[in-house]
A protein has these predicted regions:
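Catalytic-loop region of hydrolases
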Residues: 1-78
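Gly/Ser-rich "nucleophile elbow"/oxyanion-hole loop immediately N-terminal to the catalytic nucleophile
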Residues: 73-82, 157-177
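Alpha/beta-hydrolase active-site loop
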Residues: 114, 142-163
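Substrate-binding cleft and catalytic face of glycoside hydrolase catalytic domains
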Residues: 94, 131-134
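Glycine-rich nucleophile elbow surrounding the catalytic serine of serine-hydrolase chemistry
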Residues: 150, 175-181
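Structural recognition of the beta-strand scaffold that forms the well-ordered cores
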Residues: 54, 85-88, 125-130, 172-175
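Glycine-rich "HGGG/HGxG" loop immediately N-terminal to the catalytic nucleophile
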Residues: 133-141
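Short, surface-exposed "cap/lid" segments of acyl-processing enzymes
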Residues: 59-122
Length: 181
């Protein structure tokens, strides 16, 4: 059907803005918390594919915010139950937009490659939020635990809503530094 999730999310990938415009959200920000606004292919991985997503979350004041995230989807078909999601709260990479995990190449550093590969082999969908204001317009919510927590939870919801992930509702959250408080 024309409005099936496959067509909707496929169109989002095909029509996501290119270059730095990817991180500039539409106004007003559509949908509900955890909805994917748009996505684009980022890289082929050992055992999966990485995408960049822009999704809806909420500011520390309860206002709608677009937040970017990196999502890795395992190759192949999941079990009939779907795939679990691991929402990973990484540490601070810096305060500028260019330091956001989705912009800096952080998710491809050698120190975490083995972990990503192992999780993909175990059929996990992995999502890592940039957090409010990191990579996207607005103030970076650094040390605002309530906003960061919402961003990490909404990233998990976005992974579940991202049709290519074929994720189920089983969600695991881990983090350290700013992503763990």
């Amino acid at each position: 059907p024309e409005n099936s999730p496959e067509n909707i999310f496929g169109a989002l990938i095909d029509t996501a803005p290119e270059g730095l415009d990817f991180w500039i959200p539409p106004d007003p920000i559509p949908g509900r918390n955890g909805d994917v606004i748009w996505a684009r292919h980022d890289a082929d991985l050992e055992g999966g594919t990485a995408y960049l997503i822009l999704y809806r979350s909420e500011s520390v004041c309860g206002e709608p915010r677009a937040v970017s995230a990196w999502i890795a989807v395992p190759d192949g078909e999941p079990s009939s139950l779907g795939r679990p999601v691991l929402s990973w709260g990484h540490g601070t990479r810096g305060a500028g937009d260019h330091c956001a995990a989705t912009r800096s190449g952080y998710m491809y550093q050698e120190e975490i490659n083995d972990l990503i590969t192992e999780l993909l082999a175990r059929d996990f969908v992995i999502v890592a939020s940039d957090y409010e204001g990191s990579g996207t317009p607005g103030m970076y919510a650094w040390s605002q635990s309530s906003a960061l927590g919402k961003n990490i939870l909404d990233a998990a919801r976005a992974a579940q809503n991202f049709n290519l992930a074929k994720a189920n509702k089983d969600t695991f959250i881990t983090g350290f530094s700013i992503g763990g408080h």
